[in-house]
A protein has these predicted regions:
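Hydrophobic core of alpha-helical transmembrane segments in multi-pass integral membrane proteins
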Residues: 102-118
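Alpha-helical transmembrane segments of multipass membrane proteins
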Residues: 38, 42, 109-114, 133-145
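Helix-coil boundary and interhelical linker segments in multi-pass alpha-helical membrane proteins
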Residues: 114-129
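Membrane-embedded catalytic scaffold of the fatty acid hydroxylase/desaturase
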Residues: 1-103, 153-242
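A cytosolic-side transmembrane-helix exit/cap motif
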Residues: 146-154
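Hydrophobic alpha-helical transmembrane segments
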Residues: 28, 104, 127-132
Length: 248
């Protein structure tokens, strides 16, 4: 967190110099793709479509790599141990085997639910409602995570100057929300505590924050009315080490 050489956030931000080197149409599409309104279709794609695409491409990759392995072994007079190959195969689309299994099981459950609910209320009605609900909920959660790292004064270091603790404390906002929203989001507003130690469960984040208030003076509170200004910060100035809008 806070090392913008390694990770450019959920919006994959570019540097200010890279943005300046783009032509006018590329700049326009860069800004358009990071406009808050696109959180809704983008959220639906990220939550519903992207994992299924990754699963499909991962399956195709497994078949292609496996076929190449089988034919290579046959040329050398060997038989491929397929269970071992499948178990040891490292997909380009997933980090772990468990992630593959979870996505596959989730997709099968979703297909069953889609079919059942579509038959129950009509497929057109179902998909309209499903898109509205899922795109809205995904947009809200992506926005919450975005503003917890993209905010005025956020710690935006490069690799050589990066500090783990500054990244956690100064690179994570303390989103000020009503208690009911904190409950719905499982206290993720205490994001700085999460980045200090990912092993702390969500139901302990608030207690850890209160127990260490004297060490958290540099945590930046962020209020709901300030959220719109965060969406303007879509460039990383890798010289001044700060997030800036496209107009600068």
């Amino acid at each position: 967190n806070g090392n913008w050489d390694r990770y450019r956030g959920p919006s994959a931000l570019t540097t200010r110099d890279e943005y300046k080197s783009k032509n006018s149409s590329s700049r326009f599409f860069y800004r358009l793709l990071r406009h808050p309104i696109l959180l809704f279709p983008g959220g639906f794609y990220y939550l519903i479509i992207k994992p299924r695409i990754a699963l499909f491409l991962g399956f195709i990759e497994l078949i292609l790599v496996g076929s190449k392995k089988v034919f290579s072994d046959l040329r050398h007079g060997k038989f491929t141990n397929l269970p071992f190959f499948v178990d040891s195969h490292q997909s380009s689309y997933f980090y772990t085997r468990e992630e593959v299994y979870d996505t596959a099981l989730n997709s099968m459950c979703l297909l069953g639910c889609w079919g059942f609910l579509g038959n129950a209320i009509g497929h057109l009605h179902f998909w309209i409602l499903y898109f509205l609900v899922m795109s809205t909920s995904a947009a809200i959660m992506i926005a919450v995570f975005f503003v917890q790292h993209n905010f005025p004064g956020s710690y935006a270091s490069d690799e050589s100057n990066w500090s783990y603790f500054r990244g956690a404390i100064e690179g994570s906002s303390f989103l000020q929300m009503p208690p009911i929203l904190n409950w719905f989001t499982a206290d993720i507003a205490y994001h700085h505590i999460h980045h200090l130690s990912e092993r702390i469960p969500n139901y302990r984040l608030r207690d850890c924050h209160r127990a260490n208030l004297h060490l958290l003076d540099d945590v930046q509170p962020l209020y709901l009315h300030e959220i719109p200004s965060c969406f303007k910060l879509i460039l990383w100035d890798n010289v001044k080490l700060e997030l800036v809008p496209t107009g600068i």
